[in-house]
Amino acid sequence: MSFQAELVACFGQPVAENPTGAMQEAAFRAVGLDWRYLTVEVAPDALGDAVRGARAFGMRGFNLTIPHKVAVIEHLDEIAPEAAVIGAVNTVRRDAAGRLIGENTDGKGFLRGVRQDAGVDPKGLRAVVLGAGGAARAIVTELALAGVSQVLVVNRSHERGESLAADLSVKTATPIRFESWSGVYRVPADAGIFVNATSIGLFPAVDDMPAVDFADASSTLLVCDAVFNPPETRLLASARSRGLAVLDGLSMLVYQGVIGFELWTGLPAPEQVMKDALRKALSQSA
């Protein structure tokens, strides 16, 4: 018998409302692993100390959330190619030699949800992504690598939107173009996937909704929202009322966690257990 548990963690600020720990610990229990997931508030000027602590504790890995996804890179031994393209890390794994490797599972989690939950193959489709922050960078990168015909980045800030489009267009060899967002954005008829990669509609501002209009949208459009709390945002309700297929932010959160679990443990993740645990955690915090 051993009383020593393996450790993984989440470093961020703030983290009190981050439900990932409930999902991961349910998964550990389901497969019989004596592992613990620690949710730790880490200020920006303490991030280096936190990573050194993770090394000292022999942690199997850790997640990063706001504001550490970019700043953590200088403290790691290596980053995966996709994370290098995105320019951000949300998951770190410890390899057999004890080196800390940075990964980005946000975009991969989104893409797995598109394929598995929505049943859509993005290859050849035209994608529209609202926003130009970290989530948008990850989603645009993975859509480009999955073979979409074009990505349209729609953002209110010209500088951020143009920078993201220009940078990722070169890095992924995919046509990525910026379009300014002012007033109400009309989703074009030739779009196959629309993604809200902003935080508009996130709890507690559940009555907020991106200023978009689906009047011209194709009946085959898939509408996705990266906001996971609440799962049914006003944006998704609006799309659903028009008969459009939707994909909620829980899908992205679960699947990025599934990928992280598999990177840390080397075991297949109990996906349904993780989905159920996340829904339960969010319902209790509502």
Regions found by a protein language model. Give the residues of each.
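Rossmann-like adenosine-cofactor binding region
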Residues: 173-246
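Glycine-rich adenosine-cofactor-binding loop
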Residues: 12, 104-107, 114-118, 123-145, ...
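Residues at the starts of beta-strands that form the adenosine-phosphate
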Residues: 7, 36, 126, 149-151
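Phosphate/diphosphate ligand-binding glycine-rich loop within oxidoreductases
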Residues: 2-118
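Short glycine-rich anion-binding loops that position phosphate/pyrophosphate groups of nucleotides
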Residues: 60, 66-71, 134, 199-202, ...
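NAD(P)-binding Rossmann-fold cofactor-contacting core
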Residues: 146-171
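Adenosine-phosphate binding glycine-rich loop
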Residues: 124, 222, 226-286
